[in-house]
């Protein structure tokens, strides 16, 4: 583990366990030279602790670059909570996580991410002020999607010669909060949507509301399109999958695509 931290140039890695609520959490602080480490909290059923550690290290590093590129006086961090098979009280679990954050004395600020909601952030906020994207602040997903949408327009201009998205085929992998908001914005701009998600209900919603064409998750990367937009958990591009791509560009919301 220490070798992994050194390779990632991580400042610190913190662990918390709360048997009463089932909390098993990790907070990684990659770099705090510019200020407190900012990064969302993921709540996912990781296969094991090693998978969770690898994810939090990778994501924390990415947040350092994001914060720096955005000109923020903040560093990069990330948190993951290993989602248990059964939770008696989700609110109590996130309150326990809030107490964990508070022990870091402001060195880490959390926010929504995969598997978490603004209601979860409200529970965290009962025990620490170092949290954002609460219900009072609103869902940040549409704003994130707008940034990706703007990036897609710029990408289309650079690669295809026009930022007019009318008729452009965009394949979206992942229809979570950000992915679906992006799909709505692309649909409004006249793009043709090809979508996939492990949640078939989300896919059906996109078909009914946005006229999207469903594609099996395992087939999406090899589906002909103009732009591929990975909006899931990231890490989808590797030596194997890159050779399958049939798109002109990749521009999505996923971390570490």
Residue ranges and their predicted role:
Residues 108, 112, 227-237, 241-257:
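ADP-ribose/adenylate-binding Rossmann-like module
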Residues 102-106, 166, 187-192, 223, ...:
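Short, surface-exposed connector motifs at secondary-structure boundaries
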Residues 1, 9-15, 25-27, 158, ...:
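Glycine-rich, charged/polar anion/phosphate-binding loops
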Residues 47-55, 88-92, 96, 115-119, ...:
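Conserved active-site and cofactor/substrate-binding residues in soluble primary-metabolism enzymes
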Residues 139-225:
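Glycine-rich phosphate/diphosphate-binding loop of Rossmann-like nucleotide-binding domains
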Residues 1-136:
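N-terminal ligand-binding/catalytic initiation module
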Residues 21, 32-34, 48, 177-178, ...:
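Short, glycine-/Ser/Thr-/acidic-enriched flexible segments
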């Amino acid at each position: 583990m220490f070798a992994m931290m050194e390779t990632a140039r991580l400042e610190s890695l913190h662990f918390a366990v709360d048997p009463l609520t089932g909390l098993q959490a990790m907070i990684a602080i990659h770099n705090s030279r510019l200020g407190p480490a900012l990064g969302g909290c993921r709540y996912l059923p990781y296969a094991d602790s090693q998978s969770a550690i690898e994810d939090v290290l990778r994501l924390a590093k990415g947040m350092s670059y994001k914060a720096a590129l955005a000109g923020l006086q903040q560093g990069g961090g990330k948190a993951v909570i290993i989602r248990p098979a059964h939770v008696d009280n989700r609110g109590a679990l996130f309150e326990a996580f809030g107490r964990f954050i508070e022990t870091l004395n402001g060195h880490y600020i959390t926010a929504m991410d995969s598997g978490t909601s603004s209601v979860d952030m409200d529970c965290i906020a009962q025990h620490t002020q170092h949290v954002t994207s609460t219900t009072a602040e609103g869902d940040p997903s549409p704003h994130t999607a707008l940034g990706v949408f703007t990036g897609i327009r710029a990408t289309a201009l650079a690669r295809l010669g026009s930022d007019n998205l009318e008729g452009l085929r965009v394949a979206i992998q992942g229809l979570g909060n950000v992915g679906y908001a992006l799909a709505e914005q692309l649909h409004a701009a006249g793009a043709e949507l090809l979508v996939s998600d492990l949640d078939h209900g989300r896919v059906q919603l996109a078909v009914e509301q946005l006229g999207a064409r469903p594609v099996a998750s395992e087939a999406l990367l090899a589906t002909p399109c103009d732009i591929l937009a990975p909006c899931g958990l990231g890490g989808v591009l590797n030596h194997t999958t890159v050779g399958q791509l049939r798109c002109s560009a990749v521009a999505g919301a996923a971390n570490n695509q």
